[in-house]
């Protein structure tokens, strides 16, 4: 018998609301108010999300953010910066004690990401986990280099994912780009010289890919969304039951957005959860 999970999908939201809703789901599951949950979401503006410990000063080009009318938000998870634009974003909240969650962070990620692997297969893309850790230090830009066990297609990183455990609950969320505006992405970072920017941009093209690039044609969001819903359902052996948020739940989301994801929380490391 398939286990029943909640499935949440809503209209595109701004950066603070999207991050606050992920955090709220973690709280609600910890309190037993919702079952394990899979969420799909989108962004109403291009957004650069930065890792919990990632520096802004000297790294992020705030003029570039303004130029491209992007939003900037700090995630509750670690890792490098991700440009969210033409993509499907997902999140999973589940208890650390759940039988599907390994005690090892790496193994838990590996197990949960099998649903992502299956979804790519349904789309006609063969992906695998990177089996060698990067020999270089962490980049400011996600997708520039795959970390150990992250997903790659023909050696190129195709999905960026991050995980955190708080109060006995695991939250994993990730970016599934259909396409990527690399010119915009590199305008959002500071570089010592234009030559270095161009070198890094070229290297990025060699190391990162997207769904559209792999399939050679533009895919509809609906096709990608359906593949990922099926992929997670099959591999995790779950039945997804759609839910909607109550007015009170939305109020809580807006409160979290204001307290934890406002502009005041961008420069320094925020303290929440």
UniProtKB/Swiss-Prot annotation:
The active site is at residue 142. One of its GO terms (molecular function) is lipoyl(octanoyl) transferase activity. SUPFAM superfamilies: Class II aaRS and biotin synthetases. Pathway: Protein modification; protein lipoylation via endogenous pathway; protein N(6)-(lipoyl)lysine from octanoyl-[acyl-carrier-protein]. Keywords: Acyltransferase, Transferase. Its EC number is 2.3.1.181. The keyword Magnesium does not apply. GO terms for biological process: lipoate biosynthetic process; protein modification process. The record marks 157 as: Lowers pKa of active site Cys. Catalyzes the transfer of endogenously produced octanoic acid from octanoyl-acyl-carrier-protein onto the lipoyl domain of GcvH, an intermediate carrier during protein lipoylation. This is Octanoyltransferase LipM. It comes from Oceanobacillus iheyensis (strain DSM 14371 / CIP 107618 / JCM 11309 / KCTC 3954 / HTE831). The lineage of its organism: Bacteria, Bacillati, Bacillota, Bacilli, Bacillales. The gene is lipM.
């Amino acid at each position: 018998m398939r286990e029943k999970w909640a499935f949440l999908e809503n209209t595109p939201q701004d950066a603070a609301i999207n991050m606050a809703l992920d955090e709220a789901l973690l709280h609600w599951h910890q309190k037993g108010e919702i079952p394990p949950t899979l969420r799909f979401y989108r962004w109403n503006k291009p957004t650069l999300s930065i890792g919990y410990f990632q520096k802004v000063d000297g790294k992020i080009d705030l003029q570039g953010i303004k130029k491209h009318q992007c939003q900037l938000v700090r995630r509750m998870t670690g890792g490098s910066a991700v440009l969210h634009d033409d993509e499907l974003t997902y999140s999973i909240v589940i208890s650390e004690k759940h039988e599907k969650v390994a005690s090892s962070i790496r193994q838990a990620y590996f197990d949960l990401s099998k649903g992502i692997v299956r979804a790519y297969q349904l789309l006609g893309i063969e992906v695998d986990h990177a089996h060698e850790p990067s020999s270089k230090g962490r980049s400011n830009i996600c997708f520039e280099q795959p970390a150990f066990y992250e997903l790659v297609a023909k050696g190129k990183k195709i999905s960026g994912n991050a995980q955190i455990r708080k109060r006995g609950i695991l939250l994993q969320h990730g970016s599934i780009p259909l396409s990527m505006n690399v010119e915009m992405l590199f305008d959002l970072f500071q570089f010592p010289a234009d030559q270095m920017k161009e070198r890094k941009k070229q290297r990025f093209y060699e190391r990162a890919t997207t769904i559209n690039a792999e399939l050679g044609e533009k895919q509809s969001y609906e096709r990608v969304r359906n593949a990922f819903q099926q992929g997670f359902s099959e591999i995790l052996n779950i039945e997804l039951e759609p839910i909607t948020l109550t007015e009170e739940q939305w109020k809580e989301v807006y409160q979290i957005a204001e307290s934890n994801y406002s502009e005041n929380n961008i420069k320094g490391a925020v303290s929440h959860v």
